[in-house]
């Protein structure tokens, strides 16, 4: 360091345990400072180079007595030497100052200035704890010579701070971001694994740094971070640590994790008898005297407070620890520093990260998730951890060993990592397993580790927000472990209520991250195939949950070979006979088929809000309470159209009211400062911004007035609400029957068809509820004007429905426009609200049906349907991209020559794929496609999906059962079932209906066959893509379905007449006999119906007509004046009958004055009603002769007589009757395609 460097005025910090920054931060700072303290380093070398070996021996000799001092931040030795520590410079982590009191005090002012400078850099990488390690290395001379290798200047340090993590950083400065032992790992045989663990956790911010006076404690007798063998260290490349240190985004969370790892390690020390296990435990377990040598004061000193949260240091061990005295161990003070710490409620680790990484084999390059256990993965919610939970983290279960129990206690745990560690090594405890200890464990008698003494203190995990009392530290502690026997299950039970699901949900659900993709995991490219474990998964889950689920069979799982996996329609046709009886099958592609999913994180779509507790029966205790609150608010002039949102999650007002009263009312909650606890009980995510302020605001706005009512007034409100419900049900039947189809049945799109972000049956809140007298149904306002008598009736109906229960029959509402990133955050928050740890599909399934059936709490989730024409597909579409032309790419499937839907062109929700974006509990209710079309669904990324399927053959039985269950007052059962009603498969199975089930995982297809009833429940955030297909076998079923939809006045997404005529024209040219023979009978029926209706209209007096796309020059003057020429250019989607929603393709009748469209059947009714054809005009696409000729040509080809269909269409046809005056022939080339 240059002597001309100006000194800074530094405010002296108090050297108290509760002051300053934690040692993890101190180590990080000193790591960086080491590179800029060349002079001091040289001086230390000269002064202590000769006596280093002797000091190490002295350290080893004092290990037995030193452990007592190592057991707390306020240990006896640190108290006695506090004055000496004040003389020791801040870089006492250097060679000898870290081990001896007589360290050079002359450097202290300068070093404190340096430390202060470094503290202002919260994201500065850690590169200096090497000093702590160096004196511990067995060959001190070699280590000292290594110290002098690097001679950075202050200017270099500043350059590194500015350029770290960027390509502009000079190669010569790369080593700034890592400890020296990482770079010299091949040269230094005895370098410490612990230092490498420290560098792994280098990303620590200055948010919680313990007092600087703790420096000498970490260093005194503490050069014990070595001992790991070279071979063990060489197994882990140094780039892992650099990659972690070079990620600034991780640094603000990692320092709390570092502290908690220290505490966990100290709390996880082995018992006296477990020598083998203790070798794999935290570093503090080494120099411990017998507990009898401790005073109560010593035990109290074990618990030190850091930022108001207690920190547990390791306690004394039994006699077996003497066997380890020969090994170099951390000093008493250093032991404290390397234990897990809870800082501001966040569990953090410093020391054990490397050892844990090596044992659990985590994804090293994922931010803030160094291990599969998700303490580090939960970036935002992990601050819910407390002292007691950290103690549980350090514990080990009796059967699985320390590694398993230590991981189990982490709040959101990946169970696979536990099993992996338990099988691999049972020596590690509390996430602390240095390689030195692993080596030592092999040398120590293994029978000495009784598993029962490795019990963790998991029993304390349930108490969030509580400080650990001194008594908790004084419970029979051996090597920092509470000897309390806690069953292994309690480790999982005691996890905090809201463990962060964000990282787990993302890390586990998504199958990889591509560059440029944020943590929302939009990309699903996987380096490894995820198909192999899929098939076995289905079997264990088959009967999971309740016993009644055992009656469900799993749908077939198909694994086509690479050769078979080419054309989806050919493959599906080959297996149809075996799988169609199940209604559905799951297809697992070959391992090498894994297209990458790239979605724009900022794409926006309109969500759909689903009230899970209302998906079954609409009425329940929660809904009743909410109705009372709404009724009271309405009497106060307050309208609550939507529930208040906190963190994107709807607030459960009914539960809020109940809980705040159970806690004594608002005044008591405020006086006792229990708003935080109340928010936790309501499961509001801790990551939600201003959650307490919003919670209090919601109470004052919506509950305060209701809460102030007397019990009598509450009972009166309940009676009024129940009476209103009874009246409503008498008038309209049960709430489940008041579906959106009553007011907007014609908005009911196919169950999977997206339209403006809405799905099947989502109704705007101000929908029409009128019924036309002539047809008994409410026409949908799709034309440009409403029908004549509609307006007055609509007003009357809306006035009737102004009651508080007018929309309580709904369970699905229109949401708001959100980006994909916002949707993911909401999904993460809702997952955290519903589950405290990463749930398995069986757990989600059980909780889902509990919510649906019990209806005791308000659960609102979101989902979205996005047209890929607007936002792009999840499949690759570029010509040069892999899989972009593959047959199973769902953007290619609509053009497959085996699918007759290709003749329709681009139809949203039919031949254009759409994305299904869901979160936990997102539901596709029981339904079948309204056209009975088959479809293929591919799960791009994310959590699993649970599918239920009822084969088409069960239709009649299902209708009777549903009608009985829902008591539909004459409403057909299937109509009620398709009105967003979820009935448990268990109930249906008990009624004798075949229900099949499967769990679709990422990268798998689900194929649904025509007419099957299907429902789906998402297990977390995921993205899938779906598209329809159809073969010629479907046409007969599709034709009958189209007639039924017309009868029920349901809008179809495409015209069946158009499809049949397009097939006839295209296939007749190819002389495709099988296809033509299938559609010939349907064309016959269609021709007869069309010509009969035209004849009846002509007889009724409708003589004015025109052909599509032509300008009628021969029409009368009166007709010419009123003809809306612009209307003739309207698209097919707008040419719907205003009565029955039929798509008019062959012909229609137009009310020119009102610009209203009728199909021929509804026009006949209108003419009979009005007794006049005034203002009406027939519009047609083909005249009678063309229709007859086309059908004859098709029938002729089927019977073997070949003729040209082109001649039939192009030859002039005789014009008969009054039509010839108002008709202009247009050749087929001028006909619009739509």
Swiss-Prot record:
Residues 180-193 have a biased composition (Acidic residues). Residues 882-1046 form the JmjC domain. The modification N6-acetyllysine is found at residue 378. It holds the Pfam family JmjC. Residues 86-98, 265-285 have a biased composition (Low complexity). One of its GO terms (cellular component) is mitochondrion. Disruption phenotype: Embryos die before 15.5 dpc and show severe cardiac morphological defects and altered heart-specific gene expression. Some, but not all, of the homozygotes develop an abnormal groove in a region just anterior to the midbrain-hindbrain boundary on the neural plate at 8-8.5 dpc and show a defect in neural tube closure in the midbrain region. Its main location: nucleus. Widely expressed in embryos. In adults, expressed at high levels in heart, skeletal muscle, brain and thymus. Residues 555-596 form the JmjN domain. Residues 1-11, 211-221 have a biased composition (Basic residues). InterPro entries: ARID_dom (IPR001606), ARID_dom_sf (IPR036431), JmjC_dom (IPR003347), JmjN (IPR003349), Znf_C5HC2 (IPR004198). Residues 1-22, 68-150, 169-339, 354-548, 1206-1234 are annotated as: Disordered. Residues 619-711 form the ARID domain. A motif (GSGFP motif) lies at residues 872-876. CDD domains: ARID_JARD2. The modification Phosphoserine is found at residues 78, 449. The keyword Phosphoprotein applies. Regulator of histone methyltransferase complexes that plays an essential role in embryonic development, including heart and liver development, neural tube fusion process and hematopoiesis. Acts as an accessory subunit for the core PRC2 (Polycomb repressive complex 2) complex, which mediates histone H3K27 (H3K27me3) trimethylation on chromatin. Binds DNA and mediates the recruitment of the PRC2 complex to target genes in embryonic stem cells, thereby playing a key role in stem cell differentiation and normal embryonic development. Belongs to the JARID2 family. Associates with the PRC2 complex, which consists of the core components EED, EZH1 or EZH2, SUZ12, and RBBP4, and various combinations of accessory subunits including AEBP2, JARID2, PHF19, MTF2 and EPOP. Found in a monomeric PRC2.2 (class 2) complex consisting of at least SUZ12, RBBP4, AEBP2 and JARID2. Facilitates nucleosome binding of the PRC2 complex. Interacts with SUZ12 (via C2H2-type zinc finger domain); the interaction is direct; competes with EPOP for SUZ12 binding. Interacts with histone methyltransferases EHMT1/GLP1 and EHMT2/G9a. Interacts with GATA4 (via the N-terminal region). 'Jumonji' means 'cruciform' in Japanese. This is Protein Jumonji.
């Amino acid at each position: 360091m240059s002597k001309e460097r100006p000194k800074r005025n530094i405010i002296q910090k108090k050297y108290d345990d509760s002051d300053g920054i934690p040692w993890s931060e101190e180590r990080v700072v000193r790591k960086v400072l080491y590179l800029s303290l060349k002079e001091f380093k040289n001086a230390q070398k000269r002064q202590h180079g000769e006596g280093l070996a002797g000091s190490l021996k002295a350290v080893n000799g004092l290990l037995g007595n030193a452990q007592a001092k190592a057991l707390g931040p306020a240990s006896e030795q640190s108290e006695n030497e506090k004055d000496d520590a004040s003389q020791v410079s801040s870089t006492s982590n250097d060679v000898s100052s870290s081990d001896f009191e007589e360290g050079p005090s002359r450097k202290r002012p300068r070093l404190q200035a340096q430390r202060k400078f470094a503290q202002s850099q919260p994201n500065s990488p850690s590169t200096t704890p090497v000093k702590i390690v160096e004196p511990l290395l067995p060959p001190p001379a070699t280590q000292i010579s290594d110290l002098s290798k690097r001679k950075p200047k202050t200017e270099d340090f500043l350059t590194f701070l500015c350029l770290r993590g960027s390509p502009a950083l000079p190669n010569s400065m790369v080593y700034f971001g890592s400890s020296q032992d990482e770079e010299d790992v091949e040269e230094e045989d005895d370098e410490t694994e612990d230092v490498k663990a420290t560098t792994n956790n280098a990303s620590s911010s200055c948010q919680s740094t313990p007092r600087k006076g703790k420096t000498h404690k970490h260093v005194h007798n503490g050069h014990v971070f070595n001992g790991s063998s070279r071979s063990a260290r060489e197994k882990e490349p140094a780039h892992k640590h650099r990659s972690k240190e070079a990620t600034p985004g991780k640094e603000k969370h990692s320092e709390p994790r570092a502290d908690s790892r220290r505490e966990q390690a100290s709390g996880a020390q082995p018992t006296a008898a477990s020598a083998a296990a203790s070798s794999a435990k935290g570093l503090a377990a080494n120099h411990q005297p017998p507990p009898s040598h401790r005073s109560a004061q010593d035990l109290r000193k074990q618990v030190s407070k850091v930022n108001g949260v207690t920190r547990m240091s390791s306690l004394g061990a039994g006699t077996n620890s003497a066997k380890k005295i020969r090994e170099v161990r951390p000093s008493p003070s250093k032991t404290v520093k390397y234990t897990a710490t809870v800082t501001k409620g966040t569990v953090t680790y410093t020391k054990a990260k490397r050892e844990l990484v090596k044992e659990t084999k985590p994804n090293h390059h994922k931010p803030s998730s160094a291990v599969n256990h998700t303490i580090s993965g939960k970036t935002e919610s992990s601050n819910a951890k407390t002292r007691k939970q950290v103690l549980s983290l350090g514990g080990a279960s009796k059967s699985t060993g320390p590694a398993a129990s230590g991981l189990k206690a982490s709040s959101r745990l990946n169970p696979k990592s536990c099993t992996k560690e338990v099988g691999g090594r049972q020596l590690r405890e509390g996430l602390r397993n240095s390689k030195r200890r692993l080596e030592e464990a092999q040398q120590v008698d293994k029978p000495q580790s009784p598993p029962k003494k490795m019990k963790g203190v998991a029993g304390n995990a349930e108490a969030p927000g509580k400080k650990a009392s001194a008594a908790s530290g004084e419970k029979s502690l051996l090597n920092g472990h509470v000897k309390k026997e806690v069953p292994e299950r309690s480790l999982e039970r005691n996890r905090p209520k809201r463990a962060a699901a964000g990282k787990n949900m993302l890390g586990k659900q998504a199958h990889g991250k591509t560059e440029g993709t944020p943590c929302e995991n939009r990309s699903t490219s996987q380096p490894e195939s995820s198909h192999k474990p899929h098939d076995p998964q289905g079997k264990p889950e088959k009967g999971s949950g309740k016993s009644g689920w055992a009656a469900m069979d799993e749908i077939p799982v198909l694994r086509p070979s690479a050769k078979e996996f080419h054309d989806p329609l050919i493959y599906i046709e080959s297996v149809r006979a075996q799988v169609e009886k199940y209604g559905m099958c799951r297809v697992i592609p070959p391992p090498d088929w894994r297209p990458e999913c790239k979605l724009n994180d900022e794409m926006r779509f309109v969500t759909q809000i689903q009230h899970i507790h209302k998906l079954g029966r609409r009425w329940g205790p929660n809904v009743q309470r909410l109705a009372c609150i709404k009724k009271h608010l309405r009497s106060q002039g307050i309208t609550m159209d939507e529930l208040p949102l906190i963190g994107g999650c709807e607030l459960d007002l009914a539960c809020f009211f109940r809980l705040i009263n159970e806690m004594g009312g608002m005044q008591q909650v405020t006086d006792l400062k229990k708003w935080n606890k109340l928010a936790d009980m309501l499961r509001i995510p801790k990551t939600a911004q201003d959650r307490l302020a919003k919670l209090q605001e919601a109470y004052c706005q919506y509950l305060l007035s209701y809460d102030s009512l007397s019990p009598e007034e509450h009972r009166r409100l309940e009676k009024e609400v129940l009476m209103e419900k009874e009246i409503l049900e008498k008038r309209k039947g049960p709430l489940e029957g008041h579906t959106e189809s009553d007011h907007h049945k014609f908005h009911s799109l196919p169950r999977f068809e997206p339209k403006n972000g809405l799905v099947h049956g989502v109704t705007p809140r101000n929908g029409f509820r009128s019924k036309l007298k002539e047809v008994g149904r409410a026409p949908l306002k799709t034309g440009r004007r409403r029908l004549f008598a509609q307006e007055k009736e609509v007003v009357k109906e809306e006035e009737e429905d102004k009651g508080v229960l007018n929309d309580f029959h709904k369970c699905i509402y229109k949401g708001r426009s959100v980006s994909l990133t916002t949707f993911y955050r909401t999904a993460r928050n809702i997952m955290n609200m519903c589950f405290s740890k990463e749930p398995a599909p069986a757990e989600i399934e059980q909780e889902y049906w509990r919510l649906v059936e019990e209806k005791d709490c308000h659960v609102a989730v979101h989902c979205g349907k996005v047209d890929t024409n607007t936002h792009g597909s999840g499949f690759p579409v570029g010509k040069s991209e892999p899989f972009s032309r593959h047959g199973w790419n769902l953007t290619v499937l609509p053009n497959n020559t085996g699918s007759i839907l290709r003749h329709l062109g681009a139809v949203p929700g039919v031949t254009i794929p759409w994305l299904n974006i869901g979160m936990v509990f997102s539901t596709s209710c029981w339904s079948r496609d309204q056209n009975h079309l088959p479809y293929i669904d591919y799960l791009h990324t994310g959590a699993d999906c649970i599918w239920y399927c009822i084969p088409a053959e069960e239709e009649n039985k299902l209708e009777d059962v549903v009608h009985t269950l829902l008591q539909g007052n004459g409403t057909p059962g299937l109509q009620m079932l398709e009105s967003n009603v979820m009935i448990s498969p268990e109930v249906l199975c008990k009624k004798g209906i075949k229900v099949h089930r499967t769990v679709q995982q990422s990268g798998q297809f689900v194929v649904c066959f025509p007419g099957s009833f299907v429902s789906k429940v998402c297990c977390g955030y995921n993205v899938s893509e779906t598209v329809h297909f159809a073969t010629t076998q479907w046409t007969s079923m599709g034709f009958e379905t189209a007639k039924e939809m017309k009868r029920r006045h349901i809008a179809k997404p495409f015209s069946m007449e158009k499809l049949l005529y397009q097939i006839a024209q295209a296939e007749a040219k190819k002389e495709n006999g099988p296809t033509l023979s299938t559609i010939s009978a349907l064309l016959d029926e269609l021709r007869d119906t069309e010509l009969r209706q035209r004849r009846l209209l002509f007889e009724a007096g409708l003589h004015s007509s025109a052909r599509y796309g032509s300008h009628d020059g021969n029409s009368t003057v009166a007709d010419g004046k009123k003809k809306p020429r612009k209307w003739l250019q309207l698209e097919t989607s707008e040419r719907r009958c205003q009565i029955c929603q039929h798509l008019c393709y062959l012909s229609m009748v137009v009310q020119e004055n009102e610009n209203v469209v009728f199909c021929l059947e509804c026009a006949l009714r209108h003419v009979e009603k009005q007794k006049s054809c005034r203002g009406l005009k027939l519009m047609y696409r083909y005249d009678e002769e063309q229709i007859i000729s086309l059908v004859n040509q098709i029938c002729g080809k089927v019977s073997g007589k070949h003729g040209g269909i082109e001649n039939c269409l192009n030859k002039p046809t005789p014009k008969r009757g009054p039509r010839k005056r108002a008709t202009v022939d247009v050749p087929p080339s001028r006909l619009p395609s739509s």
